[in-house]
Amino acid sequence: MAPEIFVKFKCASRDIKLLWASVFLRLLSYGLTNQVLTLFLNAINMTEDKIGLFMSLTLAGDVICSYILTWYADSWGRRRVLVYGCAMMLLSGLVFSFSENFTLLLVFAIFGVISPSSDEVGPFKSIEEAMIAHLSPHNARPEIYAIHALVGTIGSALGAIICGIFVDLLKRTGLAATDLQCYKLVFLLYAFFAFCKMVIMLLLSDATELDGHYEHTDCNEETAEPLDVNDETAPLMRQATHPEERSNKLSKETVSVLMKLLVIFMVDSLGSGFMTSGWMVYYYSKQFLMGSLALGTLFFITQLVMASSTIPSSIIARCFGPVRATLLVQIPSGIFSILIPMAKNYLPLSILFLNLHFATTAMDVTPRQILLTNIIKPRDLTKVMGVVNIGKTFARCVGPIFTGILANNNYLWLCYIISGSLVITADLILACMFLGVDAKIKKQMNRH
């Protein structure tokens, strides 16, 4: 499987490689700000409950903007939407670098692109994943999505350690007199990487605008069929012959599947929102009094651990099918999350549980992408991925409010338990709704 990964990497089209570079820079940028956002807000005298509200409003704004941008991305132009997103990243970074005004920061956090954690925000993820689906055949998707997840996670890891080293260097050299000045310079670096990402988006070819209305030609692949839970099928890429297919409406079959997906992903994201990586940084900073370099090193290691799990995730998906693969990795991840606060007085054990959590938490990314791209009709894929990611972000909006309140009352540790419990619940719902399609998707993935 590993050699096959390298073959897919080497043989990938120029556009897919550019998309990999894009997700690398984006997650690197989010990794930078993830290390300092909660500490920055605390440094400008925001209370913990107010920080939680700030994060929730940021995510709520992302829901609204992402909904509009992803829903109309196909008609407005995917590349144009991605370039706009990069511009908003750049502006947000500049505002956070030069302002301490709560209202101004909140406006640019809501309408710009600032990640309250190292997770995805903005319209990028759903549009890029839809592009990859339309640029790659079914039998190559597990490896291509695994590489996509891998480079993103590596970017996030590098962002964490770069931030730690950068802040430590600023303090040692005297270039920044206070922690707050260091945090502002980190946001300036974020703006620079946003500009680099914008350049990459401008280099994408016209092929990234193609979708399910066009034939996918691959001399080694038979025409693949998307699966739905009712066993209905449709060609992977075909010419649209009915005006309804060119409209912005989803088919009835797609809406039925989408409702089930939303329940699963929103419960999962509700759990994730209770303890984002931004709050994890805050937890270790306050609970164990860790400095910037130590925090950067810790989350660099956790992100590397998470990155190393993305390749095995494609192997597990091929062997067991996407649904069983998700269950095998996500239930242990939830359990490890619950165990983290049990070691709140013993740092080495806490770090062990944290790394075990990160080792399993991202292993469901590839299986879930495979599930989505196999049960959704190609012409609906961009919109469905957009709605799913928006639903996930909306669900994540709820958690930070309660996290802030709990943190303000010295119960931040409880959020680990709530988070893990909700993730396990989402996995059980997934098993009930989609376990039956595993065998067919597995067969389609392993077709040569």
Swiss-Prot record:
Intervals, Cytoplasmic compartment: 72-93, 168-184, 282-287, 355-386, 438-448
InterPro entries: MFS, MFS_dom, MFS_trans_sf
Domain of life: Eukaryota
GO annotations of cellular component type: fungal-type vacuole membrane
Taxonomic classification: Eukaryota, Fungi, Dikarya, Ascomycota, Saccharomycotina
Location in or out of the cell: Membrane
Binding, ATP: G386, V387, V388, N389, I390, G391, K392, T393
Protein topology in the membrane: Multi-pass membrane protein
GO molecular function, one term: ATP binding
Protein name from the UniProt record: Uncharacterized membrane protein YJR124C
